[in-house]
Amino acid sequence: MNVLSSICYGGDYNPEQWPEEIWYEDAKLMQKAGVNLVSLGIFSWSKIEPSDGVFDFEWLDKVIDILYDHGVYINLGTATATTPAWFVKKYPDSLPIDESGVILSFGSRQHYCPNHPQLITHIKRLVRAIAERYKNHPALKMWHVNNEYACHVSKCFCENCAVAFRKWLKERYKTIDELNERWGTNFWGQRYNHWDEINPPRKAPTFINPSQELDYYRFMNDSILKLFLTEKEILREVTPDIPVSTNFMGSFKPLNYFQWAQHVDIVTWDSYPDPREGLPIQHAMMNDLMRSLRKGQPFILMEQVTSHVNWRDINVPKPPGVMRLWSYATIARGADGIMFFQWRQSRAGAEKFHGAMVPHFLNENNRIYREVTQLGQELKKLDCLVGSRIKAEVAIIFDWENWWAVELSSKPHNKLRYIPIVEAYYRELYKRNIAVDFVRPSDDLTKYKVVIAPMLYMVKEGEDENLRQFVANGGTLIVSFFSGIVDENDRVHLGGYPGPLRDILGIFVEEFVPYPETKVNKIYSNDGEYDCTTWADIIRLEGAEPLATFKGDWYAGLPAVTRNCYGKGEGIYVGTYPDSNYLGRLLEQVFAKHHINPILEVAENVEVQQRETDEWKYLIIINHNDYEVTLSLPEDKIYQNMIDGKCFRGGELRIQGVDVAVLREHDEAGKV
């Protein structure tokens, strides 16, 4: 679903922070900058409803009309991101409570319990009032529900949540005996006889039952999703043709975005990579993840910053050109919109030093606004990209419930973190410009040739069969250490590790050897010696062949990496955390077998992605280096640079440092 027929460009707009004369100035500046969409009213509950049941829309009417008169459309917020002071005063028990029993007070934002009944009642009234007010306004193009759900309060442990949790558990398990079985409550004498004996996993003397903790992750995710769906139901009823979304936050642990994405019309998300980290690999990974949530549907980058944020210890600015560069890198991975937080930099409040499209002091030479305007004018030329897709032959399994489970306490290695392991594999694809999707273990895998499963600790019923069929039909499955260990309740799969994946991989893991942070071992393969860290599996072969063996320690000579033929395909098991050199070589060998090639052969730190429509192919090339690079395009093609409009024959192409090229591909006859 496209919000506009062009690339969306703009940012969060908070006119309630400014006098009316600034509104007109803002609209003119937006017009000059090429802004066509702003997110409006996100934190305006206290302004729209200054007292219980009393609504004031006059100011918002005027703002929307001014913007529309200047060609700016509205992504209208439902204003539910922060409850007003009058609501908190009237319903003090609506404030969230943490695991230690501490009440989180008013004075910040997101200070509400998602299961408070009066919160839900008041949200319904507010959202319906806003929807009815603006349902026929031609400026309305999209709904922005709440804001960054769970960003600050992902779990509440109050009595309202306790009651709701018991109800959720009863619906899930039906009987208390089934819950006891699934949670393993005979351990440490935790057995329950009645539902009302169960509480949220509050602060306890020592380790909490991990099955209970895992279910509380699920419960809170469902509780917050229910809030979103409460609003969406009203918006769909009143404005059935207006797309509804809420802004995600990439690899945000508390919310299962694969589940959430089924309920939004378009994925939108917020991204704030640190300029100090250089090459924005995790930003690229999150763009690919966000695109994958709705099976490749283009998304909108709802928030980024023009220069610097305010919430890190040290908030360095993006150097000149980097905001533009990273924006194009986002478009390259499937974005149909580039938005910012925020339009005008705040004068007061907690984010007054957070960068914006219009800084505190604006003159004709201001670098930030100049770059904002340049990008806005360029994006007007890229309407052709709207709706185009990315085709990938490689997928990485990413599973939120697996993430929750693998990072619960009481593991062999309690410093293991899921995202760095996923990123280690992704990094090798990124460096080689191999397009990649993210999938769940239960998703349809038939269009992929290679599927990578980093630390798939949890394998739920049926997921192993999906992976088994993928391999049997000719795919390559690459599985990392500490995979196939538990079921959906964090109960160990009996019969040996890696549980239901043993037959696919042709191995048996006898023991785990977690490494201290300073320990480095070596692995041998037929092409050299490589470092490995973090973990070693003691592997016994059950039909697989070793691709690499450990050099040191008491398990020297035992397999570290294995390959097993299964059906028409193969299962590769990586029983350690090898260095980038080894992972890269391993993946290159697999890709060569499947004839998976980079889109272009390019210099280091040059990012290339291809977006496609039924008619055209578009190459988006980003030079992250600060120096010029030269690359070769096929000489039998004609290319059009969509930014400057020039056409040229393939061959040598030069791209300046910190610069981009967006090329439409033609054949000799001028067609795809």
UniProtKB/Swiss-Prot annotation:
Q: Which GO terms describe its molecular function?
A: beta-galactosidase activity; metal ion binding
Q: How does activity depend on pH?
A: Optimum pH is 7.0. Retains more than 80% of the activity at a pH range of 6.0-7.5.
Q: Does the keyword rRNA-binding apply?
A: no
Q: How does activity depend on temperature?
A: Optimum temperature for the activity is 70 degrees Celsius using ONPG as substrate. Stable up to 70 degrees Celsius. Retains 80% of the activity at 75 degrees Celsius. Kinetics of thermal inactivation and half-life times at 60, 65 and 70 degrees Celsius are 120, 50 and 9 hours, respectively.
Q: Biotech: how is it used?
A: Has potential for enzyme application in low-lactose milk production during milk pasteurization.
**Protein name (record):** Beta-galactosidase bgaB
Catalytic activity, reaction form: Hydrolysis of terminal non-reducing beta-D-galactose residues in beta-D-galactosides
Q: Gene Ontology cellular component?
A: beta-galactosidase complex
Q: Which GO terms describe its biological process?
A: galactose metabolic process
Q: Which gene does this sequence derive from?
A: bgaB
